[in-house]
Amino acid sequence: MACAPAVPPCWTRRAKLKERKLFIWLWYVLATLAVAADQVVKLWVRRNMALGEARPFIPHFIELYHTVNTGGAFSLFNRYTWALTTISAILTVFLILALWKGWFVSNRFSQLCVTLVLAGAAGNLIDRAAFGKVTDMFNFTFMKFGVFNVADICVVSGVIGYAGYTIFTQFQEDHSHEADAERPQ
C-alpha cells in the first residue's frame, strides 16, 4: 500500500501566509466598522445637539454631552492640534503596517488590540484633519472624568488589552524559565 506524498513545506507555509493575510483583512474590516461607528455617533451629536448640551443616555451613569477637544486625552496639548494630527497620521500608518507585516502582533488577541488602537487613532485623526478638533460626547454622571468618544474607547481598550496580555505572557514566561531552572537535570 502506497503512502500519499508529503505536502512540500513551501505549500504549508503558503497556506499559513494566506490564512494570516485573510485575518489581516478581517482586522482591517473591523477597524473600518469601528471608525464608521465613531464617525456616525460624532455626526449625530454634531447635528442633533448644541455645543454644551447634555442628554441622559444611561440614567445615573452616563450622559451624552456635546463638547469638542482640540487637544489629546483630557485636553492635553490643546494648543498643538497640528502636532497631534501629524502623530495620529504616523501612528495610523504604522499600525496598518504592523498588522500587515506581523510586527509585535503574534496572535489573534494582540491583533485585535492593535486593531482597536488603529480604529481609535484613525477615528480621531479624521476629526482633527477635517475640523481641527475632536467631537466628544460620553460623560460619566456619577464621577468626575473626561468626556470621551467611541474612538477613545477603542484606543483605551486596545492599549489596556495589549498591555495586560504582554504583562501576563511575560509573567508566564518568567515562571516557566524558573520552573525549568529548578527541574533536576
Segments predicted by a language model, with ranges:
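Alpha-helical transmembrane bundles and membrane-interface segments of multipass inner-membrane proteins
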Residues: A2-Q185
